[in-house]
Amino acid sequence: MKNKRNNEKYKVGKNLKGKEMEIDVAFFSGKERAESSDGVEALKTEKIIKPVNGISAVILAAGKGTRMKSDKTKVLHEVSGKPMLAHVIDACLEARVSDITVVAGANMQQLKSFAAARYNGKNIRFVLQKEQLGTADAVNSVIKAKIPLKDGVMILSGDTPLITADTVSYLIKMFTKKSDGGIIGVSFAENPAGYGRIVRNSEDYVMRIVEDKDADDREKTIKVINGGIYIIRKDSLERNLEKIKVNKAKGEYYLTDIAALMYAEGRPLIPVDVPYRELAGVNSRAQLAEAAKIRNKKVLEKLSENGITIVDFDTVYIEEGVEIGNETVIHPFTVIKSGVKIGKNCSIGPSAHLRQGAVIGNNCKIGNYVEVKNSTVGNNTNVAHLSYIGDSEIGSNVNIGAGTITANYDGVKKNKTVIGDGAYVGSNSVFVAPVKIGKNSVIGAGSVITDNVPDDSLAIARPRQETKTGWVKKRRKK
């Protein structure tokens, strides 16, 4: 019988009590199943699934990332405004996994500095993997360090920035309800070349994981691949890590070998389908860009579902952590960084750049080639063309003319510009901060404002125009 890939419930085999198990998303097909019915005698023995007393996360982040060609460690390169490792940690925290251990190598100090700045007060430990001896050795470093792990140990890679809290939660649910040994995240790939293949018995328990280079002709036809995310009972993990032998060709210990060991002892891994994209590891700058593109699309889709119009998904870039009000329109070639807040009924772009600290009120227009950074813009205010607003406080009902610049940096520190409610700023004006413009004041076009302007005042700060009638004709006669 063939089970087609679809979104229906799918029976993955009987558990130790003889009851059929299901996962929410089917991915197996008959032709991909390893043609083996060996089974394990221990599986036929009825056993009760032991309750799980909590989940610990172990995140592998010691890799050198040489293909990135960077002094910055690979897992700290950013996707959608935050480091890859932060995406993985945040997915765990959002899934209520607060006991987290990160395995580091030579990048230990970089990772500790990152965590101190971003997760101060969170229970995040670091363990050193002294030598790069493979994924099993990395996990064993945590065991040898006598970290007090909980009953379920979730193992993830720090370079998978597309992983979501929903997937982590789903895997934990499947582990606690279905497995007496462990589960492994897997996915279906039309082109599985380069990935480890999941070899299963007739009941869909994982018999072993075969790396692509080691797969025979039959195994190469398997399209169910290893996702590199596991949840394994602590006692089984500790016991089987000690049994993993070094790969003679590479001189490393592979965590994938644990699948065959767990199968042999009658506590096999259960395969659980996870979205293919979420498994993708980042090893190069090109893959980093691809991950950012995928993350960005998810951000835009979510905003669209909440009543925001994104005119062109291909050219708008919005990082995670941005708040945008209903009925706002984001035009093409606009970049909005994490932490920006935009009110309702606004028009942003095209080609606008909103950076950290920008807070835009309701019914505002931030138009062509406008950059706003660390500034508040009040309700019903227009900054329509070719302007830089930095370290500023702009009131409500203000009109900022084209080419306006807030000159905020004096060579030592950033200074603030304040423009009161109802002010009108003529085109090509420059505010040399610190400076304050009063309510309902008017700034003449082309002015360079260096002094404060009181409420209801007109300020003009430009050379007086001088016109010499007939000057051109006189010049020609010379």
Q: Which residues does each PLM region occupy?
A:
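Glycine-rich hexapeptide-repeat left-handed beta-helix
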Residues: M1-R5, F27-G30, G39, L43, ...
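Conserved N-terminal catalytic core of the sugar/cofactor nucleotidyltransferase
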Residues: K2-K4, E8-F28, D38-S56, P83-L156, ...
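Conserved alpha/beta core of the MobA/IspD/sugar-nucleotide pyrophosphorylase nucleotidyltransferase superfamily
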Residues: I48-N53, K223-T315, E323
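Glycine-rich N-terminal loop/short-helix segment of MobA-like nucleotidyltransferase
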Residues: N53-V79, A95
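Short, high-confidence coil segments that cap the C-terminus of an alpha-helix
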Residues: V97, K150, S179-G182, R267
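Conserved core of the sugar-phosphate nucleotidyltransferase
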Residues: I163-A249
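Glycine/small-residue-rich pyrophosphate-binding loop that anchors the diphosphate of NDP-sugar donors
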Residues: N226-I229, E320, N415, A433
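Acidic, glycine-rich loop-and-beta core segments that form the ion-binding/anion-interacting portion
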Residues: I318-I366, E371
